[in-house]
């Protein structure tokens, strides 16, 4: 309540003037409509109204649904008149509780009270500066040197050195295949803290594999290190073909509530899975025009983790992470969204790839009728992956890959008329072949259908280093964000003739099974080589 004897008139043309006054003077005054100051029952608390206005401004989100557009009539407030008479002030004073604390500036003019408060704030700032003065907090040792805090060295993240020598295999996990069930991997994804690896497997769900425990504190690895048999700590059984999956960006194994990932599967809504026990936490459902559940094609978290971007055949749905269910904002598009990428510098824009081979950049604050801000081409197949890399001074480069396309295109987003660099790899199938960028944006690694891993040094832009790591298609490549460890996954769907019973089938490159052939079947034999594996490699310094 106001304790000062003053009288003022305020007229607001709109809510923005009222909100600006409230932010400058966040006090509680009495608001009377139509200039009626004598009747206190008709008064309205201005702080409550201005609080609602401020919350309305701060929560003013862009709506992508035509039914959620706010009319212009809702953006204006009637002219308000505020009048405080001496009788009202006395009435307010007499109505205070008995145990109320008397303000030290009660009964003085408002200008004097504000001056006293500013002087008190100045004294507090001087006292605060004196208390936290850096000279008072330094500790000196006996020889006069300044003592360093114990955690100062831990606060500085070490610079990871990738590909400093020959790769050392750390461990692997294999899945068998047959002509009836081909369990090939579909990529691999390191968690943001680098402790575990997510591996989707065809007809076998999703697996979470932990990094070997002896590597957490390792600076170097001996070439003669014994192999670790990688095991699945969490297994989510197959419920449908996995289209895409993504980790929560702030995942930390020391905080179990953050250990989760999203996955979209065939004929299912988006599911959030717990990385500790594999339980289902919640679901985010997208529905079509006839109210049937649609499966998302691609997924992405916002960098703060508060929103989920899901790409569908004709729209982008934006879910609030804290609100599971079907409530979302729709942003209509013309093509199916096959992959999504975003920069930290522009949280309101999305870069999306589609099955027609185009890359489109959308500003979600604009109407969908405006269309994309720009469209990029250059690939002959559908876009399978997009990845942004920061090269310092706010310089963002976009890397794009496509199916049945041997090129990885690097785009400078300051001038995107043509690609900056074309990086060549070998991709001759429709399968998604992953590539990954190092945390310092100095190295780019990609698999190919021949089983090789191509590594480019982005500081030199020379020919890639070709590493023959697999005997089957290398579909997944992931660089650990916390350790110099490279994870690769292999496997693909092999087209075999079910009637050709005389084929030689090789499982994971270790054993060969020759099936008997009946007399009436052609004896032409065909060798089919399967290698469905995920392997971890040490790519740092070796001892």
UniProtKB/Swiss-Prot annotation:
PANTHER family: TELOMERASE CAJAL BODY PROTEIN 1
GO MF: box C/D sno(s)RNA binding; protein-RNA adaptor activity; RNA binding
Start-end of Acidic residues biased regions: 116-127
Signal sequence interval, chain numbering: none
Extent of the WD repeats: 237-283, 291-329, 378-421
Name used for this protein in its record: Telomerase Cajal body protein 1 homolog
Keywords, alphabetical: Chaperone, Nucleus, Repeat, RNA-binding, WD repeat
Region called Disordered, residue ranges: 95-128
GO biological processes: Cajal body organization
The species this protein was found in: Drosophila melanogaster
Ranges in coiled-coil conformation: none
Its biological purpose: RNA chaperone that plays a key role in Cajal body formation. Specifically recognizes and binds the Cajal body box (CAB box) present in both small Cajal body RNAs (scaRNAs). Probably acts by mediating localization of scaRNAs to Cajal bodies.
Family note: Belongs to the TCAB1 family.
Subcellular location: Nucleus, Cajal body
One Gene Ontology term, aspect cellular component: Cajal body
Keyword Ribonucleoprotein belongs to the record: no
């Amino acid at each position: 309540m106001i304790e000062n004897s003053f009288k003022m008139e305020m007229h607001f043309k709109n809510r923005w003037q009222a909100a600006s006054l409230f932010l400058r003077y966040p006090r509680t005054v009495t608001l009377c409509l139509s200039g009626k100051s004598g009747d206190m029952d008709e008064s309205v608390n201005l702080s409550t109204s201005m609080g609602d206005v401020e919350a309305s401004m701060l929560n003013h989100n862009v709506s992508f649904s035509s039914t959620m557009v706010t009319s212009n009539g809702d953006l204006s407030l009637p002219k308000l008149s505020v009048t405080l008479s001496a009788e009202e002030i006395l009435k307010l004073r007499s109505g205070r509780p008995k145990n109320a604390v008397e303000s030290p500036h009660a009964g003085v003019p408002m200008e004097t009270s504000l001056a006293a408060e500013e002087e008190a704030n100045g004294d507090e700032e001087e006292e605060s500066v004196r208390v936290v003065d850096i000279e008072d907090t330094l500790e000196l040792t006996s020889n006069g040197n300044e003592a360093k805090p114990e955690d100062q060295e831990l606060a500085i993240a070490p610079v990871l050195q990738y590909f400093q020598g020959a790769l050392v295999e750390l461990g692997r996990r294999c899945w068998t295949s047959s002509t009836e069930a081909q369990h090939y991997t579909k990529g691999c994804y390191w968690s943001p803290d680098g402790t575990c690896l997510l591996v989707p497997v065809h007809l076998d769900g999703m697996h979470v594999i932990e990094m070997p425990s002896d590597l957490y504190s390792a600076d170097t690895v001996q070439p003669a290190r014994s192999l670790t048999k990688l095991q699945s700590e969490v297994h989510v059984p197959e419920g449908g073909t996995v289209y895409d999956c993504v980790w929560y960006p702030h995942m930390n194994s020391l905080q179990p509530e953050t250990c989760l990932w999203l996955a979209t599967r065939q004929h299912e809504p988006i599911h959030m899975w717990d990385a500790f026990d594999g339980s289902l936490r919640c679901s985010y459902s997208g529905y079509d025009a006839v109210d049937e559940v649609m499966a998302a094609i691609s997924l992405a978290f916002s960098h703060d983790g508060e929103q989920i971007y899901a790409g569908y055949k004709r729209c982008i749905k934006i879910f609030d992470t804290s609100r599971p269910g079907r409530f979302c904002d729709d942003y209509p598009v013309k093509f199916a969204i096959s992959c999504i990428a975003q920069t930290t510098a522009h949280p309101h824009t999305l870069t999306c790839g589609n099955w027609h081979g185009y890359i489109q950049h959308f500003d979600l604050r604009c109407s969908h009728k405006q269309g994309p801000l720009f469209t990029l081409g250059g690939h002959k197949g559908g876009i399978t992956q997009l990845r942004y890399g920061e090269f310092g001074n706010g310089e963002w480069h976009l890397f794009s890959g496509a199916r049945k396309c041997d090129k990885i295109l690097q785009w400078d987003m300051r001038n995107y008329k043509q690609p900056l660099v074309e990086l060549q790899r070998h991709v001759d199938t429709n399968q998604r072949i992953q590539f990954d960028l190092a945390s310092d944006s100095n190295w780019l690694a990609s698999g190919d259908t021949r089983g090789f891993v191509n590594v480019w040094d982005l500081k030199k832009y020379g020919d890639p280093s070709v590493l023959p790591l697999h005997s089957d298609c290398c579909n997944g490549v992931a660089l650990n964000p916390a350790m110099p460890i490279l994870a690769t996954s292999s496997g693909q769907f092999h087209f075999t003739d079910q009637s050709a019973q005389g084929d030689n089938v090789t499982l994971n490159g270790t054993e060969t099974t020759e099936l008997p052939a009946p007399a009436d079947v052609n004896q032409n034999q065909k060798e089919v080589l399967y290698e469905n594996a995920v392997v971890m490699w040490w790519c740092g310094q070796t001892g």
